[in-house]
Amino acid sequence: MTTSLLLHPRWPESLMYVYEDSAAESGIGGGGGGGGGGTGGAGGGCSGASPGKAPSMDGLGSSCPASHCRDLLPHPVLGRPPAPLGAPQGAVYTDIPAPEAARQCAPPPAPPTSSSATLGYGYPFGGSYYGCRLSHNVNLQQKPCAYHPGDKYPEPSGALPGDDLSSRAKEFAFYPSFASSYQAMPGYLDVSVVPGISGHPEPRHDALIPVEGYQHWALSNGWDSQVYCSKEQSQSAHLWKSPFPDVVPLQPEVSSYRRGRKKRVPYTKVQLKELEKEYAASKFITKEKRRRISATTNLSERQVTIWFQNRRVKEKKVVSKSKAPHLHST
């Protein structure tokens, strides 16, 4: 079985890769590629198996079996004119199922591609072969990832539409055999990082939360409930509520933290006598008078000013109370 792969790189001539499955089919694929020549140095791949083929690609120097190789053929075999240098680039990959595991040739080095190019690669994992591809702009129906099992896993079938692939760019899909060795541990959150964990083409966005085996804290004093602690106990200790009625949160001393009024210090009789004398002389104090009273009474100028203000308010209240009965009587 021979399948052609068409590429449109930046080179003057587009290239075609021929993928062969067995040595018996090598002669069939070699007949169509006899017209190619001079392009073997442009790409990389594996050496050919039949003498009638185009010059083989020995640039990579990779050792592959002669029954499973890719050869480089010139584009004019298809009967199409060569693509210009400035033409928009694109590449199309077609997945080829292989009956045997891990017998893939190394892909040729991809030329510098634009944002609409397709990158394909493969790597062996255990006894199986995984071939994955990053697609930016694909218009054909194809698989984003081909899995070639070793001996007991069949190849999952089903193709994805092109529009589904374009919306799921740079997405990997891994199949059940890869995740079968993983076992979710109880009490932990298993959030899916890769959108596609199973072989199903649709992406999976849910998170597995296996909590059936979860057990709360085992307290030594026999409490049968969970304990919740506040992260900001130092700042909001009064908001913390304990599920246990006998637990009381520690309350900090309010007097040490709260900025309240200073303790009232009463004036002495000598100070009050001096202040009353000055108030009787004048209800309003001047700057020079305030300094003199402050020096004689050992009080600050602010204290003297406040006392005079309070004294005027007190006198005003006394006068208003004395006038109130006189108004009611008339």
Swiss-Prot record:
One GO term describing the cellular component: chromatin
Protein name (database record): Homeobox protein Hox-C13
Keyword Nucleus: yes
GO biological process, one term: regulation of transcription by RNA polymerase II
Region feature Disordered, mapped onto this chain: 30-50
Molecular-function GO term, any one: RNA polymerase II cis-regulatory region sequence-specific DNA binding
Keyword DNA-binding: yes
Disease with which this protein is associated in UniProt: Ectodermal dysplasia 9, hair/nail type: A form of ectodermal dysplasia, a heterogeneous group of disorders due to abnormal development of two or more ectodermal structures such as hair, teeth, nails and sweat glands, with or without any additional clinical sign. Each combination of clinical features represents a different type of ectodermal dysplasia. ECTD9 is characterized by hypotrichosis and nail dystrophy without non-ectodermal or other ectodermal manifestations.
Species this protein is from: Homo sapiens
Location of the DNA-binding region in this protein: 260-319
Taxonomic placement: Eukaryota, Metazoa, Chordata, Craniata, Vertebrata
Compositional bias (Gly residues): 30-47
Protein family according to the UniProt entry: Belongs to the Abd-B homeobox family.
Role according to the record: Transcription factor which plays a role in hair follicle differentiation. Regulates FOXQ1 expression and that of other hair-specific genes.
Sorted UniProt keywords: Developmental protein, Disease variant, DNA-binding, Ectodermal dysplasia, Homeobox, Nucleus, Transcription, Transcription regulation
